[in-house]
Amino acid sequence: MSNSQLQPESLAEYLAHLPMSDQQRAELAGCQSFSELHQRLSSSTFDGPTDAAQASVGQRLTLSTAAELEEAEMLAVDAEGRVCLKATPPIRRTKVVPEPWRTNILVRGWRRLTGRTNPPAPKKDERVLPAARWRTVGSIRRYILLVLMLGQTIVAGWYMKGIMPYQGWSFVDLEEVMHQPLMQTAQQVLPYALQTSILILFGILFCWVSAGFWTALMGFLELLTGHDKYRISGASAGNEPIPKDARTALVMPICNEDVPRVFAGLRATFESVAATGDLDRFDFFVLSDSNDSDICVAEQQAWLDVCREAKGFGKIFYRRRRRRVKRKSGNLDDFCRRWGGDYKYMVVLDADSVMSGECLTSLVRLMEATPDAGIIQTAPRASGMDTLYARMQQFATRVYGPLFTAGLHFWQLGESHYWGHNAIIRMQPFIEHCALAPLPGKGAFAGAILSHDFVEAALMRRAGWGVWIAYDLPGSYEELPPNLLDELKRDRRWCHGNLMNFRLFLVKGMHPVHRAVFLTGVMSYLSAPLWFFFLVLSTALLAVNTLMEPQYFLEPRQLYPLWPQWHPDKAIALFSTTIVLLFLPKLLSIILIWAKGAKEFGGKFKVTLSMLLEMLFSMLLAPVRMIFHTRFVLAAFLGWAATWNSPQRDDDSTPWSEAVKRHGPQTLLGFCWALLVIWLNPSFLWWLVPIVGSLMLSIPVSVISSRVGLGLKSRDESLFLIPEEYAPPQALLATDQYTHENRWHALNDGFVRAVVDPQQNALACALATSRHTQAEPIEWLRQERVRHALKVGPAALNNSERLALLSDPVALGRLHEQVWSEGHSEWLSAWRQSVDADPHAPLLPLQPLNAAPQPA
């Protein structure tokens, strides 16, 4: 129901939500209509009554931020004379053209045989650079790694073969087997077929474990001695002035994220860079792909707040894409196309990333000192979460992670990994060589590339540029999922992306190291179904040994019977060796902490106890992850879509109902598996207890480990303590403080606010990007959208309709004016409820930003 007569209480309510003095409100209180109010606010004319609110956008916007906006020259007008905010710098387009993928080696070979020309090989950048000895050293090191892995696997495989009970494959006459009854053939061949399959799977899995062991071992030696002549961080002295032309863009692609946390981390990073005195070399970009209308409005307000509070106008930019093409890689492509030519370097941040100013300026100096480096990846340190699960994962990555990152650097040198965030990229080669075309074909492994980081690193190396890990560079931080289920949601996306990337394994021109990176990416998830099938086949072999009568004679006139053999000594030796390979890296990590000082980890006793508890916890979770990852791999091959929702980044506990729903099938599998083994051979259950027991306990372990209270209690006891908790760096302190403040005045029901609230509407109109010139079809569409929104109210509008209104400043302004002038109760009631739901109680600061670090 609407009322065309202006009600005094409505006018007073409207004016009360504008930041002006009582005298200004008194002067405007005599307005006879909202059109007159907007005209007096704007001191200008407008096209008609329905465009009254559009005319006052500039004045409503500058009531609280006039000085800051004018100083930074942030206000402008579009071609139609409408006020807009310059939230992005001027566009200077750069050509970004992805190269089509040719993934089929058979097609390339056939074209070569038939005389048809294949497309030319990708050109490397022609640069005059001094010869790099690290390339030769890296190749030699990787050959050594390959020999160590294969040699270790061959020895272990030989032992495994000797453990197997049936040793008579050579006596099986395949020709005779084909002409005898099927049941007799099965009795003879099945045990040997199972053993062979088990042996093959064992070899693959042992080789995978061996690679991790040698990587951690070399990382331990690197960190213990501190002598690494090829580390990238040694290329710069660390205090050289940054050249004026070394402009760097910090880009943060986001999509439906936790807005208070995102802009808190951005502000902390911005202020840390400002403290170095080199802020004039950096610009900050928030590149939003959000499609939730409430979150979009909250992002706009958060951007304005952080610019005002941190004096970031003209340095912190915000853009929201309306066409979300190619997910994150498409978002970065779009940035490179519009503004990439203005910058020499680009630092990619994740939504939960925080980086110190010293780290960022060091990265720029390293790029300047290493002219053949295309990407330098930092080793982000996990921190900031309080659930028991997240704290154990933070401890694991902080204690064991440095060994593996240093080991990766030892084997790969300048042909290393890029993890998609907390890294600096040289813009020119990235634009020219790293744009990603969709994978050809149809199905689950075609289309836009999901895990873009490994592919971009491979393309950068293919073009002749180095990809380095600065594993010893401090000041780079990230956050981990708060619980097991949220981590597994992320793993499903990564699993699908890594399986897609393997299609590029044989693409022409890829460096062998990055072909191996694609392979290791696949094995990170394919190892789970391989391990699962290994256990299933082992159980099947147990069933064969128990239920089938052994065949002692496999050929006619065989003189001696083939007795099943058992070698418990070899089994124990092989089992012990495998345990050493799995757990020695963790022990080496603790030894390294003992050697360098364990105070920041809670002391020698507490860090050792934390390691033992984490080992037990990881053993409990390994079978659970195995089952989930097996499901993910099968889902990818069967074409089941993986949703690409943003991960949970706040401390979040798992409810029992959700745990039962997700882990119930695993629990049932664990009980059934255990009962089957007990029925076959109870003594074998002791070997399988770590697997089936973990599956049975998956529900309580998942729920209990997600509790914040247990995480805080463990921190009070100095368990799973990390240096970032013992003595938090300034950037993390600031992030916590700003997150706390942002949550206090966080915007809820953003879309309703953008329509009804005087200030939010002005901001949304000024940032709307659909700025069409006058045209009859567009005008008709605007009228229909406004009419429909007024008719059905905010609750009935779907998200697409909301986004269309947010993108059009004219339609949004008209809707705002008509809601107030006609008194639409549904819109006004929804807005009042949203305002009443705001948290009004002031919150005390967590701790002073400049306080001295205190031990936990």
UniProtKB/Swiss-Prot annotation:
Source organism superkingdom: Bacteria
SUPFAM superfamilies, A to Z: Nucleotide-diphospho-sugar transferases
Main location group: membrane
One cellular component term from this protein's GO annotations in UniProt: plasma membrane
Annotated keywords: Cell inner membrane, Cell membrane, Glycosyltransferase, Membrane, Transferase, Transmembrane, Transmembrane helix
Membrane-protein topology: Multi-pass membrane protein
InterPro entries per the UniProt record, alphabetical: Glucans_biosynth_gluTrFase_H, Glyco_trans_2-like, Glycosyltr_2/OpgH_subfam, Nucleotide-diphossugar_trans
Enzyme class, spelled out: transferase
Gene Ontology MF annotations: hexosyltransferase activity
Entry's localization field: Cell inner membrane
EC identifiers of the protein: 2.4.1.-
Annotated metabolic or biological route of this protein: Glycan metabolism; osmoregulated periplasmic glucan (OPG) biosynthesis
GO BP of this protein: glucan biosynthetic process
CDD domains in UniProt: Glucan_BSP_MdoH (cd04191)
PANTHER family given in the database record: CELLULOSE SYNTHASE CATALYTIC SUBUNIT A [UDP-FORMING] (PTHR43867), GLUCANS BIOSYNTHESIS GLUCOSYLTRANSFERASE H (PTHR43867:SF5)
Family: Belongs to the glycosyltransferase 2 family. OpgH subfamily.
Protein name as it appears in the record: Glucans biosynthesis glucosyltransferase H
Species whose genome carries this gene: Pseudomonas fluorescens (strain ATCC BAA-477 / NRRL B-23932 / Pf-5)
